[in-house]
């Protein structure tokens, strides 16, 4: 057991370091190339997203979704376990300082997610049924002109859908329901399988309609509950912020040199959890944004900036403050149970049930969203209906199995798959960054604030 534990810890160290060097590096580079536009053109970003929320563009194609539905579906895959369970895991593994690095990484992630969405819309095409399809596999194929890398990404995407989009989600939901209501893990797993199985036939249009209603409501309720906790614990907040920044930039970490600092535990865990939360650089969100009804790749890319802000900058920070305001991290509670306990200590016993139901709802939406990503990856590789059916059966089986796996094993698997999926996507974004920069510059020339 010790050798297995040692191997897992070593794997986490390697994956964490790779996340920092690859994703943070790409995010910083693109932020500079795009002249920090999420900050400089902040007003335009929000005006062209939420300001146009009820404006419906001309139909982009059969089976497409609105820009907001695309964003809601992408957020369904990120909000929930990454914000509720992932933050708790980050605090236990990397300490309060990890939260600061989640926030820092989220700023640079905005440019990265913007870039991959722009490319997804620019290189999208229509399938045999007249549906818009896009994503990294298409800009790898037609932009980088590497069908091999496109196929590799598709294989990795289909594989990752079983980790971040499946095992981690069902595990979080099952753990939360058991902690709050004593529901056995297999029961929650079976209910999740039934829900996902019944909705498989709806396709992207149905998923978009569900998520555009469920995600805003659940996120709003969760933020209101979090605000109540923080108001009741307001006197603790100054000390919490001091602790977070002190541990994020500790002298001990800095003494290891710049490289030692960058691969220190708080930075590793913060960036890795931040990526799990907002998925910037992974290439998942571009798959659904590539099907959005839009006449502008840049405007659709703005939604990626908003996603990162809402998901990591806002939701993750709020969750971290709630957990830290409730007590220390040295107990036996982990993941969803730790977050639920934090709400319960301040708001009372019923709060734990609320958190658990929230996690289940978010997890179910995430599983649906990632099933779409996985199916599109499989569809890119083969037109075989049998292959798609095999994927769906395997996906449903994984939902059930994930509910009963250990929390540590699930996160280790998810992080590794996230990294493998991100490598070809980030490489493509960097190779095609001139396309993104040109589109961004031309857009702001035509639409001056």
Per-range role (PLM):
Residues 36-65, 89-91, 95-99, 111-144, ...:
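Flexible loop linkers connecting adjacent transmembrane helices
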Residues 22-46, 171-177, 184-245, 378, ...:
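Membrane-interface loop-to-helix entry segments
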Residues 114-124, 128, 227-243, 251, ...:
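Extracellular/periplasmic helix-exit of transmembrane alpha-helices
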Residues 1-77, 81, 92-98, 109, ...:
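N-terminal alpha-helical transmembrane segments of multi-pass membrane transport
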Residues 3, 33-38, 82-87, 163-174, ...:
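Transmembrane helix-loop junctions in multi-pass membrane proteins
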Residues 57-92, 119-137, 141, 155-158, ...:
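Alpha-helical membrane segments and immediately flanking helix-loop junctions
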Residues 108-116, 190-204, 215-235, 268, ...:
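Selective recognition of specific alpha-helical transmembrane segments in multi-pass small-molecule
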Residues 30-31, 105-130, 136-171, 175-200, ...:
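Helix-loop-helix module between adjacent transmembrane segments
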């Amino acid at each position: 057991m010790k050798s297995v534990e040692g191997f897992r810890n070593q794997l986490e160290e390697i994956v964490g370091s790779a996340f920092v060097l690859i994703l943070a590096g790409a995010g910083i580079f693109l932020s500079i190339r795009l002249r920090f536009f999420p900050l400089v053109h902040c007003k335009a970003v929000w005006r062209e997203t939420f300001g146009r929320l009820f404006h419906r563009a001309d139909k982009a194609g059969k089976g497409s979704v609105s820009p907001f539905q695309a964003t809601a579906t992408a957020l369904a895959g990120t909000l929930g376990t990454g914000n509720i369970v992932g933050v708790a895991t980050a605090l236990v593994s990397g300490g309060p300082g990890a939260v600061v690095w989640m926030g820092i990484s989220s700023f640079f992630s905005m440019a990265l997610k913007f870039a991959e969405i722009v490319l997804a819309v620019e290189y999208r095409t229509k399938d045999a049924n007249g549906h818009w399809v896009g994503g990294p596999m298409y800009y790898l194929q037609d932009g980088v002109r590497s069908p091999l890398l496109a196929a590799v990404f598709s294989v990795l995407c289909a594989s990752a859908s079983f980790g971040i989009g499946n095992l981690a989600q069902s595990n979080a939901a099952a753990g939360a329901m058991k902690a709050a209501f004593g529901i056995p893990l297999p029961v929650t797993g079976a209910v999740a399988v039934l829900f996902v199985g019944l909705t498989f036939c709806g396709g992207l249009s149905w998923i978009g309609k569900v998520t555009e209603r469920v995600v805003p409501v659940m996120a709003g309720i969760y933020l209101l509950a979090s605000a109540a906790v923080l108001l009741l614990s307001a006197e603790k907040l100054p000390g919490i912020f001091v602790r977070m920044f002190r541990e994020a930039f500790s002298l001990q970490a800095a003494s290891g040199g710049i490289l030692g600092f960058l691969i220190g535990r708080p930075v590793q865990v913060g960036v890795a959890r931040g990526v799990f939360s907002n998925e910037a650089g992974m290439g998942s969100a571009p798959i659904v944004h590539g099907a959005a009804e839009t006449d502008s790749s840049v405007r659709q890319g703005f939604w990626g900036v908003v996603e990162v802000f809402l998901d990591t900058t806002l939701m993750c920070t709020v969750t971290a403050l709630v957990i830290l305001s409730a007590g220390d991290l040295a107990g036996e509670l982990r993941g969803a149970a730790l977050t639920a306990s934090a709400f319960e200590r301040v708001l009372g016993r019923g709060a734990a049930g609320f958190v658990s139901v929230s996690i289940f709802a978010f997890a179910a939406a995430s599983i649906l969203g990632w099933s779409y990503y996985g199916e599109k990856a499989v569809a890119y590789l083969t037109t075989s209906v049998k292959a798609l059916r095999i994927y769906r059966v395997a996906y449903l089986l994984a939902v059930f199995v994930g509910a009963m796996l250990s929390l540590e094993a699930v996160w280790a698997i998810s992080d590794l798959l996230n990294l493998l999926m991100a490598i070809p996507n980030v490489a493509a974004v960097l190779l095609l960054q001139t396309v993104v920069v040109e589109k961004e510059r031309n857009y702001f020339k035509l639409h001056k604030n």
